[in-house]
Amino acid sequence: MNADEKHVKRVKIRLHELREASDAAELDKFLARRKGIINVEVIADFFTVTVTYDDRLTTPGQIIADLSSIRFTPEGSTILND
Protein backbone atom coordinates (compact mmCIF):
# COMPACT_ATOMS: atom_id res chain seq x y z
CA MET A 1 0.00 0.00 0.00
CA ASN A 2 1.50 3.32 -0.98
CA ALA A 3 1.23 6.48 1.11
CA ASP A 4 -1.78 7.80 -0.80
CA GLU A 5 -3.75 4.55 -0.55
CA LYS A 6 -3.73 4.56 3.24
CA HIS A 7 -5.60 7.88 3.18
CA VAL A 8 -8.42 6.47 1.03
CA LYS A 9 -11.41 5.70 3.26
CA ARG A 10 -15.05 4.82 2.69
CA VAL A 11 -18.17 5.80 4.56
CA LYS A 12 -21.70 4.48 4.01
CA ILE A 13 -24.39 7.03 4.82
CA ARG A 14 -28.07 6.17 5.17
CA LEU A 15 -30.35 8.99 4.06
CA HIS A 16 -33.88 9.80 5.16
CA GLU A 17 -35.12 9.39 1.59
CA LEU A 18 -34.24 9.49 -2.07
CA ARG A 19 -37.46 10.12 -3.92
CA GLU A 20 -36.44 9.62 -7.53
CA ALA A 21 -33.59 8.70 -9.78
CA SER A 22 -33.07 12.42 -10.34
CA ASP A 23 -32.38 12.80 -6.60
CA ALA A 24 -29.65 10.17 -6.85
CA ALA A 25 -28.15 11.91 -9.87
CA GLU A 26 -28.22 15.30 -8.09
CA LEU A 27 -26.57 13.78 -5.03
CA ASP A 28 -23.88 12.07 -7.10
CA LYS A 29 -23.12 15.26 -9.05
CA PHE A 30 -23.03 17.41 -5.90
CA LEU A 31 -20.67 15.12 -4.00
CA ALA A 32 -18.39 14.58 -7.00
CA ARG A 33 -17.59 18.32 -6.95
CA ARG A 34 -16.59 18.33 -3.27
CA LYS A 35 -12.93 18.46 -2.30
CA GLY A 36 -11.48 15.08 -1.32
CA ILE A 37 -14.26 12.95 -2.81
CA ILE A 38 -12.88 10.12 -4.94
CA ASN A 39 -16.01 8.11 -5.78
CA VAL A 40 -19.73 8.14 -5.01
CA GLU A 41 -22.05 5.12 -5.22
CA VAL A 42 -25.74 5.82 -4.70
CA ILE A 43 -28.17 2.98 -3.97
CA ALA A 44 -31.54 4.72 -4.26
CA ASP A 45 -33.64 1.64 -3.37
CA PHE A 46 -32.01 1.46 0.04
CA PHE A 47 -31.51 5.22 0.57
CA THR A 48 -27.77 4.82 0.97
CA VAL A 49 -24.71 6.43 -0.50
CA THR A 50 -21.19 5.04 -0.20
CA VAL A 51 -18.54 7.71 -0.49
CA THR A 52 -14.85 7.00 -1.07
CA TYR A 53 -12.78 9.94 0.11
CA ASP A 54 -9.27 11.11 0.97
CA ASP A 55 -9.12 11.59 4.74
CA ARG A 56 -6.53 14.34 4.35
CA LEU A 57 -9.06 16.52 2.52
CA THR A 58 -12.44 15.74 4.10
CA THR A 59 -14.11 13.78 6.90
CA PRO A 60 -17.35 11.81 7.25
CA GLY A 61 -18.69 14.67 9.37
CA GLN A 62 -18.01 17.17 6.59
CA ILE A 63 -19.61 14.88 4.00
CA ILE A 64 -22.72 14.56 6.20
CA ALA A 65 -22.83 18.36 6.66
CA ASP A 66 -22.58 18.79 2.89
CA LEU A 67 -25.48 16.38 2.35
CA SER A 68 -27.59 18.18 4.94
CA SER A 69 -26.98 21.48 3.16
CA ILE A 70 -28.73 20.23 0.01
CA ARG A 71 -31.87 18.80 1.66
CA PHE A 72 -30.73 15.18 2.05
CA THR A 73 -31.13 14.26 5.69
CA PRO A 74 -28.62 11.67 6.87
CA GLU A 75 -29.97 9.16 9.41
CA GLY A 76 -26.66 7.53 10.24
CA SER A 77 -23.29 6.53 8.90
CA THR A 78 -20.91 3.59 9.01
CA ILE A 79 -17.18 3.80 8.40
CA LEU A 80 -16.21 0.93 6.11
CA ASN A 81 -12.84 -0.67 6.75
CA ASP A 82 -11.84 -2.49 3.59
Feature-to-residue mapping (PLM):
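Conserved short beta-strand edge segments in small beta-sheet-based binding/regulatory domains
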Residues: 70-82
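Short glycine-/aliphatic-rich beta-strand segments at the starts of folded cytosolic domains
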Residues: 2-18
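A generic structural motif
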Residues: 47-52
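Long, contiguous binding/interaction regions
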Residues: 3, 42-43, 61-65, 76-77
